[in-house]
Amino acid sequence: MKPIVMIILENCPHCKNARRWMEEHKEEKPQYQVLQVEMIDEKLHPEVIQTYSYYYVPTYYVAGVKVHEGVPTKEIVCSVFEQALSKN
């Protein structure tokens, strides 16, 4: 299992949707329940996000590699989870 980092802004509507979809996926697919997502709010932790390269939130990194940036869909969130579970 690979680590997931999600960069967000607290009041971002797209971030709220992504968080809701993450919870829905975890309820629908038991294999996703083991996944831990480290959420970093760029406003609260500007010193941490300086090490990441992105323009839009939410942005997902899996094992240190950016896998999605910007407006997500439920399918994109599923893809992020699948990448975190993959052996490659």
Task: Tell what function each PLM region has.
Residues 17-20, 51-52, 72:
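Generic recognition of short, well-ordered alpha-helical segments
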Residues 51-61:
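Structural micro-motif
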